[in-house]
């Protein structure tokens, strides 16, 4: 045992001072004291000071707080203080692991990394970590996505189903083995690929041709359909929508059938509804065979919803629809418990005052009610102050990397019970790749050096074997099913009102002579044919090169 000093000054059961004897001890070091009544008690150094004695000699002292001792599987605090002059020793790994709760069990562990300052492996209980909601919060560049991927690797190894909302296509790198062997050796990690356990769905097949096209169920009531509209509907417009849905009740229908049903309604208010429905139809999200909840949630499998390149309202539409369908299925006990990760959560459940998203309501519901049905939420954001405070406060496990913004720190403090100024100071001083772990999974907030990934930390483009400025071209065969086609459907009902030409402010363009018009039309057609030939030729040439 390494003696580091003795207790000095006033002592309480929870706090005391240590007069150091020159041993190498730093802030955050774990120490132990042998209590007369309770045996070895674990404590932690919270501050170190240097000063001069009256005799002019240097004095090094430290402040420490008591963590406790383990009795009958429960961590307890001593009821009586230590004695002045009691000896203080460096804590051993066995005591630290036992008291804080880092011991590895046979099943259901998550290996996060090592305990800062002593290198002890940090294993946390799966049930206590993810089954009561998780938040991963950090400033940009602090290692947030890297940390999330470490968690995902552990969940896949434990056969936990995962659904990932991925606005920037950050998570396909889970398919590629890590080749940073030195870093992996430091954490006893082996390279791995989870390609066989991952399915990508995309809202934009042209930018991610290897993914499956995301198709959603077209089953809504009036309120649900109103929620996903790009703008708010008036009561008259809702009534038109209600009547149209009533016409289609009991039959299979498409978005275009719904548009036709609205056309049969009377009054000018229907044209706004038609315009909004056409904007939803243009997304292509309701074309083709829809994915089911059972497609998304499978044991030991991760479904990545790639939203990259889609407009914000389309992203929110997707999250709203998927979250509602998954939550409804969980309430009916149709799916196994799963991990629902929301990246860029501040865009999908913003705090009031930072805007409103159509997905906010369902995510608040999942945060407050989801855990009892087995739907375990993970909120990921680099702007904690902009995330709904009620959602954040429902996360029982917080993994906090470096944050320096005062507003973000305030939001974090409000979401954590027992948050102290010392914890705030620790968060601001974290290095890249370090995280403060707080929650039921540990008896005391701890600083963790996040382990090396088993998979490679690279962009999705690099994961496909291309450089970032040479995106992969889709083959013509793969592209053909996703080419946008004009939807032909029978136009029924009255035509939309035409503008009064007499009221047009701008004068009409002079009509070209007939012969000039014919020539211009001919040149335009030739240009279109030439351009079409070049585009098709580009894909055919690419396919021929691939065959060679």
Go through the PLM ranges and name each one.
Residues 365-369, 373-451:
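Conserved ATP-driven motor cores of ASCE-family P-loop NTPases powering translocation/secretion/packaging/pilus
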Residues 165, 342, 380-381:
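Hydrophobic residues in beta-strands of the RecA-like P-loop NTPase core, especially within AAA+ ATPase
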Residues 433-548:
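Conserved P-loop NTPase motor module
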Residues 50, 68-71, 131, 168-172, ...:
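Conserved nucleotide-binding/hydrolysis micro-motifs of P-loop NTPases
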Residues 1-137, 146-153, 158, 333-336, ...:
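Basic- and hydrophobic-enriched, low-structure N-terminal and domain-boundary segments
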Residues 107-199, 437, 469:
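Glycine-rich phosphate-binding loop of nucleotide-binding enzymes
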Residues 150-151, 170, 224-225, 240-243, ...:
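Alpha-helical scaffold elements adjacent to nucleotide-binding pockets in ATP/GTP-utilizing enzyme cores
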Residues 154, 169, 173, 179, ...:
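P-loop NTPase motor domains
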